[in-house]
C-alpha cells in the first residue's frame, strides 16, 4: 500500500529540514509536471499546483496516486522524479517519496539516490550511512554515486557543520580512501575532491596513503605550498610516486627530496606515525564491516627506507642535466650533503672546484663548506691532520657571520683531540663576539660560542666544567636572553638523561656531528 497522507503529515511534523529559498522554484515545478510520468495524475492536481511549496506538492501528488490507484511501476516513476527534482528545495520531499518507494518494495533510481545523499542534512542518518544502506542492494556501485558520497564526506553534512565540525577525521579519511580505491581505473575524479584529502594527509603527518590518492593525476606542483610541512616519510612516498623528470623539474620539491635523502641514511616511521597507522587500520576494519567488503588498503611494504640508492639516483640526474650549475642554492646544498653528511671528500673537492669556476661571487660560502667538510670528517674519524688542513680554507676577510661559525666549528671539532685548544679559541673570541641577537634565531654570536664550548666539554663527560662555563657566562652577561639560556639548559638536561643510561659521551659526540652538519 502507498503511504497514507496521515503518515506523511506525521513525518512532516518530525522533519528537521527547512524550506530552501529558490527564485525559480515555480519554473522547476512547471517543468517537472510536464514530464510524461505525471500524465496519469496531471489533470487531478489543483490548478494552482505550480505556486505551492514542494512539500504541499508532494501531498497532492501522493493523494492523486492513491486515489487513482496508479500502477506500481508508473507510481515509482513519479516518486523518483519528485526526489530527483525537488530534494534540493525541500529535503522532506526526498524522505516522503523514498518511504513511499519502500512501501512499494522498490528502490529509488540512481539519480534519486544521488539527490537523497547530496541533499541529506545528516541529522537523522549521515550520508555515509545512507550510502552503505543503498550499496548493500547494488551489485556494482556506480562511480558517479561514489563521487557524490566523497563530496559529502569532504564538505560535511549540514548537521556536522551546525555542530561545529571544521576538519576531516581519520574515520573520514579511511572512508574517502575506500571510495577512491573503488572508482573505475579510468574514472576522472575532479581535483577539487582529491586536493582536500591530500591537504589533510600532509597537515596530519599521515604515512602510507599518499600513493592511493596521487593516482588521480595530481601535478607535483600542487605540493609546492606544502612540501616544507611534509614528514620525511611522506617525502619518500612523493619521491617514489613521481618520475625523476617530474622531481627535477620542480625546484621546491627537488630541494626537499635532496635534503631528506641526503641527510638521512635511512627513513623510518616514528612512534607517532606507527600510532596513526594503527588507528587507520581500526577504521579500515570498521569500513570493511559496514560495506561488507574484503577491501584492504595496500600500505607500502617498508617501515624503514634506506636512502643511499635514491640519493645517488637523484644526484646523477642533477649532474646529467647540469641543474646544479644553474642554481647556487642547490650546488651549496650538494656540497653540504656530500661533504659534511656523507664524507665523500674526493667527490666533494671535485664539485668544489667546478663550483668555484661557476659561482665566482660565492667563493666565501664555498670555502666555508670546504673548511666544514674537513672539520666534520676530521672529528668523525679523529683525524687531526684533516682539522689542520681545514684551516687553510679560512680567509682573513670572511664576514663576521661566517667568522663566528668558523670559531664555533673549531671549538667543537677539536673537542676530541685537544679540548684545551677549544677553550683557547673560545677565550680568544668571546670578548669580540657580537651581543646583538639574530632576528631569525634570537641568538647572539656570544650565545653560539658559549653553547659550542659547553657542548665540547659535555662530549668529554666534563659536566662540572660545562656548568662552570654556563654560570660564568650568565654572570658576565655573555648570554643574550632567555632563548639562549633555555637552549643551553636543555643541552645540560639531555646530557643528564644520557648519563643515566651511560651513553652520555656517545650522545654528545653525535650532537657535535649534527651541530656541524646543520650549522
From Swiss-Prot:
GO terms for cellular component: mitochondrion. The keyword Mitochondrion applies. Associates with the mitochondrial ribosome. It comes from Saccharomyces cerevisiae (strain ATCC 204508 / S288c) (Baker's yeast). Keywords: Mitochondrion, Transit peptide. It comes from the Eukaryota. Coiled coil: none annotated. Present with 3280 molecules/cell in log phase SD medium. Component of MIOREX complexes, large expressome-like assemblies of ribosomes with factors involved in all the steps of post-transcriptional gene expression. This is MIOREX complex component 12. Residues 1-35 form a transit peptide. The keyword Protein biosynthesis does not apply. Its main location: mitochondrion. It is found in: Mitochondrion.
Amino acid at each position: 500500500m502507498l503511504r497514507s497522507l496521515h503518515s506523511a503529515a506525521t513525518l512532516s511534523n518530525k522533519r528537521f529540514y527547512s524550506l530552501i529559498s529558490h527564485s525559480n522554484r515555480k519554473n522547476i515545478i512547471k517543468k517537472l509536471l510536464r514530464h510524461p510520468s505525471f500524465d496519469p495524475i496531471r489533470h487531478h492536481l489543483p490548478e494552482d499546483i505550480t505556486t505551492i511549496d514542494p512539500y504541499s506538492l508532494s501531498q497532492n501528488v501522493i493523494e492523486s496516486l492513491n486515489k487513482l490507484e496508479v500502477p506500481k511501476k508508473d507510481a515509482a516513476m513519479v516518486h523518483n522524479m519528485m526526489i530527483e527534482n525537488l530534494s534540493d528545495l525541500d529535503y522532506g520531499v526526498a524522505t516522503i517519496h523514498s518511504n513511499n518507494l519502500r512501501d512499494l518494495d522498490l528502490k529509488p533510481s540512481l539519480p534519486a539516490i544521488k539527490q537523497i545523499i547530496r541533499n541529506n542534512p545528516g541529522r537523522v542518518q549521515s550520508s555515509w550511512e545512507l550510502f552503505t544502506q543503498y550499496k548493500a542492494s547494488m551489485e556494482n556501485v556506480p562511480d558517479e554515486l561514489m563521487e557524490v558520497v566523497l563530496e559529502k564526506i569532504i564538505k560535511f553534512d549540514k548537521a556536522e557543520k551546525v555542530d561545529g565540525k571544521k576538519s576531516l577525521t581519520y574515520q573520514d579519511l579511511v572512508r574517502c580512501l575506500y571510495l577512491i580505491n573503488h572508482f573505475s581505473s579510468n574514472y576522472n575524479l575532479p581535483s577539487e575532491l582529491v586536493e582536500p584529502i591530500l591537504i589533510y594527509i600532509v597537515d596530519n603527518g599521515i604515512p602510507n596513503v599518499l600513493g592511493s590518492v596521487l593516482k588521480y593525476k595530481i601535478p607535483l606542483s600542487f605540493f609546492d605550498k606544502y612540501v616544507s610541512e611534509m614528514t620525511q616519510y611522506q617525502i619518500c612516498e612523493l619521491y617514489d610516486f613521481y618520475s625523476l623528470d617530474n622531481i627535477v623539474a620542480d625546484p621546491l620539491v627537488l630541494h626537499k627530496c635532496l635534503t631528506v635523502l641526503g641527510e638521512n641514511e635511512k627513513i623510518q616511521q616514528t612512534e607517532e606515525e606507527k600510532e596513526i597507522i594503527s588507528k587507520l587500520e581500526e577504521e579500515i576494519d570498521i569500513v570493511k564491516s559496514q560495506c561488507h567488503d574484503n577491501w584492504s588498503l595496500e600500505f607500502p611494504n617498508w617501515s624503514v627506507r634506506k636512502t643511499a640508492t635514491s640519493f645517488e639516483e637523484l644526484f646523477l640526474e642533477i649532474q646529467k642535466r647540469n641543474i646544479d650549475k644553474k642554481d647556487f642554492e642547490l650546488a651549496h646544498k650538494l656540497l653540504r650533503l656530500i661533504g659534511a653528511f656523507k664524507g665523500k671528500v674526493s667527490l666533494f673537492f671535485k664539485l668544489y672546484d667546478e663550483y668555484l669556476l661557476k659561482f665566482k661571487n660565492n667563493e666565501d660560502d664555498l670555502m666555508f663548506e670546504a673548511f666544514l667538510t674537513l672539520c666534520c670528517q676530521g672529528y668523525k674519524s679523529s683525524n687531526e691532520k684533516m682539522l689542520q688542513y681545514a684551516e687553510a680554507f679560512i680567509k682573513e676577510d670572511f664576514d663576521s657571520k661566517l667568522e663566528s661559525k668558523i670559531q664555533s666549528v673549531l671549538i667543537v671539532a677539536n673537542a676530541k683531540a685537544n679540548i684545551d685548544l677549544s677553550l683557547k679559541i673560545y677565550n680568544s673570541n668571546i670578548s669580540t663576539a657580537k651581543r646583538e641577537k639574530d632576528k631569525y634565531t634570537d641568538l647572539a654570536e656570544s650565545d653560539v660560542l658559549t653553547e659550542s664550548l659547553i657542548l665540547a666539554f659535555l662530549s668529554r663527560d666534563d659536566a662540572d666544567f660545562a656548568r662552570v662555563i654556563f654560570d660564568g657566562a650568565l654572570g658576565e652577561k655573555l648570554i643574550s636572553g632567555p632563548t639562549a639560556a633555555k637552549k643551553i639548559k636543555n643541552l645540560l638536561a639531555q646530557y643528564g638523561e644520557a648519563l643515566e643510561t651511560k651513553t652520555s659521551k656517545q650522545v654528545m659526540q653525535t650532537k657535535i656531528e649534527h651541530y656541524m652538519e646543520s650549522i
